[in-house]
């Protein structure tokens, strides 16, 4: 590994839609390529040496609630690596439930943009257990599921979250 990337970690993503691993083109619904079972995909990444997995409930991102919880709970129960989950986490209860199940980091997007205080409202956070994801398209933050522009500049929008307790690393 080169000196420049000595602290660099590749984190594979397992994006789930309709209970299957998918890849969307440009975050657009209807453009997906399907890759099969999320549990098998997660296991495959772990078997290849991944130390962290990035799990995304794409249905949750689009619909505003956790949809693929069963698949993710199976991954949480069996994966022996750090897990970060996003997509459809809109309430403190959603975040707390995932952290209590053993997720290392919850990722808040739409909920954090619409109600920044949610970051501070998640009780008993461990350092780094809450991450804010600001998705941008066309130079502005977009929510939910990358469908609506907010008019917010991504760099300016990011400013308050660290003070509220969000962070990528413990």
Cite the ranges covered by each PLM segment.
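Short catalytic helix/loop segments, enriched in acidic residues and glycine
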Residues: 28-46
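Hydrophobic faces of well-ordered beta-strands that scaffold small-molecule active sites
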Residues: 10-14, 53-55, 83-87, 106-108, ...
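Catalytic cores of alpha/beta
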Residues: 78-106
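Non-catalytic positions within long, well-ordered alpha-helices that form the structural scaffold/packing
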Residues: 46-49, 96-100, 162
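Haloarchaeal acidic low-complexity proteome signature biased toward cell-envelope/secretome components but also
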Residues: 1-10
